[in-house]
Amino acid sequence: WIMGHMVNAIYQIQEFVSLGANSIEFDINFDTDANPIYTYHGVPCDCFRSCLHYEYISDFLKALREHTLPGNPKYKENLVLFVFDLKTNSLYDSQAYTAGQKLAENIFQYYWANGEGMPVSGYLVISIPNLQHYDLIKGFRETIKAKGHNELLDRVGYDFSANDNIPDVENAYKKVGVVNHVWQSDGITNCISRGLTRAKEAVSERDGGGVINKVYVWTIDKYQSMRDALDANVDGIMTNYPNILVEVLKEDAYKDRFRLAKNYDDPFVTFEG
């Protein structure tokens, strides 16, 4: 998975897909009542990037729908996976459930079109930066189930993004009954280098049949860092430069070991190859 980083403006969707991304990540900000309001990162952010792009969440979700709705003029066949980087650290722990409810309501209305019409092809990863906000997952799932559309949860996965100890992450999932559809991230801003020790631990847990199905690292922009991540057998690399990763994947060491995920690949099934 080539995961385009910090795609917070609608026009950037086309830009990152054109560079080779089959997945994009964006930042979701909440107001004091736990309503998701807009996509926005703010400063500081990654080196050599503009931090200030934003869209209102309703507009952004509608744009995501257009890009993953077969038959729509903007449909992008190779755009498969969306990572919702939730900025919930501004919220109290007690607001996590409500944040999950309200996020689900927005996605259901604006991306899934209230469960009506032709289904969209995108998959979602709900990425949470605080282990204490595990109830956000519960609020999200219960809201979708209450709308009578359990099948939509087949297209939703989860991630805790704060580089916590892997056993602590697993315990958080146990508290809300999550046993699959788990992506595990590991990383830091591209301005700072980070080793792959924890990422390799997550890969071992994935391959050992644990709750983790996929592992991705962020934010990786240099050729050698991408090679190192691929050598660690991660499933995805989040980058500001998808085109560089496209080039690396064509190298002799990787062209037969990896292929780009397509829209017929389930991003929540552990790859066995």
From Swiss-Prot:
It holds the Pfam family GDPD_2. GO terms for cellular component: extracellular region. Binds 1 Mg(2+) ion per subunit. It is found in: Secreted. It catalyses: an N-(acyl)-sphingosylphosphocholine = an N-(acyl)-sphingosyl-1,3-cyclic phosphate + choline; an N-(acyl)-sphingosylphosphoethanolamine = an N-(acyl)-sphingosyl-1,3-cyclic phosphate + ethanolamine; a 1-acyl-sn-glycero-3-phosphocholine = a 1-acyl-sn-glycero-2,3-cyclic phosphate + choline; a 1-acyl-sn-glycero-3-phosphoethanolamine = a 1-acyl-sn-glycero-2,3-cyclic phosphate + ethanolamine. The active site is at 5, 41 (nucleophile). InterPro entries: PLC-like_Pdiesterase_TIM-brl. Disulfide bonds join 45-51, 47-191. Its cofactor is Mg(2+). Expressed by the venom gland. Keywords: Cytolysis, Dermonecrotic toxin, Disulfide bond, Hemolysis, Lipid degradation, Lipid metabolism, Lyase, Magnesium, Metal-binding, Secreted, Toxin. One of its GO terms (biological process) is killing of cells of another organism. Mg(2+) binds at residues 25, 27, 85. Dermonecrotic toxins cleave the phosphodiester linkage between the phosphate and headgroup of certain phospholipids (sphingolipid and lysolipid substrates), forming an alcohol (often choline) and a cyclic phosphate. This toxin acts on sphingomyelin (SM). It may also act on ceramide phosphoethanolamine (CPE), lysophosphatidylcholine (LPC) and lysophosphatidylethanolamine (LPE), but not on lysophosphatidylserine (LPS), and lysophosphatidylglycerol (LPG). It acts by transphosphatidylation, releasing exclusively cyclic phosphate products as second products. This is Dermonecrotic toxin LapSicTox-alphaII1. It comes from Loxosceles apachea.
